[in-house]
C-alpha cells in the first residue's frame, strides 16, 4: 500500500478526466479572455479541480482586474488560506477568507464558488464548496449587498493563473467550468463514490453554461484554452505549451516531489514545474538537500525517470519512508538504513556504503529507476541501458523515490518524470496499462506511480 495517497485514489471513477494544465509562476503562465459583452454579474458559478505545488505565497487562481480600485480575485493567500474578494471603488464589497489552510500537495481539491448577490439570505451570496461540502468557517466573511455586481462576466479581461501582472499560480488545474446565470450545487459537478466515500468528478458537458460560460478540459495540446462547452469562449494561452498539458488529474493522481516532506532546519531545495523540477545550490560542505516523492510503496513494481539538467553531483534512488535516520541537513537516502541510490559519478550507494556500479551520467542523460518490491531488487538505467540489478535487503518497509544534490558550492538540477514529464519527450512510452509518458521503454510488468496503478498493483 502507498504511504501517502491523495484523496483522488480510486481505480474506477466512472468518469475519467484525461488532462490537467500545469501552471508555473517562474514561467509567468496564465490564460486570458475578455468577454465581448457583459452578462450576469450578480449570478454565476465557477468549479475546478486543483492540485497545489508551491506553498506559502499569494497565488491567484483567477483575476478580473480593471484597475487598482476595481478588481476581483480568487486566490491562495500567503498563509495558504482560500481567499475570494470583490473590491470596487476602493472598498471591499464582498470577501471570504477561510480558516482552513490548503497545504496538501499530493491530491486535487474540487473548489466550487457561487456568486448570487440577489439571494435573500445575505450569507448565501458568496458560497464556497470544497470536495462537495460547503465551507462555513471563515476568518473574514463580508457579504455583498443585495444586487451587488461582481467583476466576473464583465467586459474586463478575465485571467486564470494570475491577477493583473502578478501573483502567478503554481499547480495543476483540471475540469475548469464557469456557468453564467445559474447557482450550481456540488452535485452538478461531482459525487461521493458509494464504496470509498471519496469525492469524484462527474460529466459536466450537459450543463447549461450560459452566454459567458465555458468548459476547459485541456485535452487539445495545440489549443489549451479551447472551450468545449459549445460557446467557443476560448482563452488565449500565455507562456503555456503542449509540455504543460499533464495526465496528472483528479481521477488519476501522479506522484510529484513533496516540498512538505523535509525535516531539518530549512535546508530546502527549490521546486518548480508542478514539483517536478528539483534545484539546489550547495553553499558549502555538507549543504545537501534531499527531496522525496508524494507516494511511497512497499509492494509491486514501479518505474520513474529523471533528466539531469547539469553535470554537478547528484544522486537518485529510493529511500526508507518509515523511519529513516536523518543527518543534520535532513537527508537520509545515503544513510545506513536509508535506501539505494545511483550517483552521477557511476557509483551506487547501498544503505550508506558507496561502491562502483555503472556508467557516469551528466547533462541531458535520462536515468530510469525500476523498483521491484515483489522480488526485492532495484535496477537503474542510463538512457535505456540497464546498469544491473541491486538487491533490496531491508524489506517490509515503505520506500519512496528520492533525489539529492551532493556537491560543494555548485547547483544540481534535474527533472523528475513519474509519467507526467515537465520536459519534451522524443519517443513516448507508457506502461502496460497505458499510463505515463516516458523517454525510454518501461520494463515489462512495471508501472507508473499513479493512483489507478496503485489501486490495482499497490
Regions found by a protein language model. Name each.
Residues 28-85, 90, 120-122, 182-187, ...:
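Extracellular glycan-recognition modules
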Residues 2-19, 26-27, 120-122, 127, ...:
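Extended recognition patches within non-cytosolic domains
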Residues 46-54, 111-113, 160, 173-177, ...:
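Short hydrophobic/aromatic patches on beta-strands that form ligand-binding or substrate-lining surfaces
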Residues 52, 254-342:
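Conserved, ordered domain cores of eukaryotic regulatory proteins
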Residues 87, 149-173, 405-409:
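Extracellular glycan-interaction patches encoded by glycine-rich segments
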Residues 1-42, 79-83, 88-93, 154-159, ...:
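Low-complexity, glycine/proline/serine-rich flexible segments
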Residues 3-25, 47-56, 73-147, 341-344, ...:
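Extracellular glycan-interaction surfaces
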Residues 34-46, 99-109, 151-154, 165-172, ...:
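Extracellular/lumenal carbohydrate-interaction signature centered on repeated Trp-anchored short motifs
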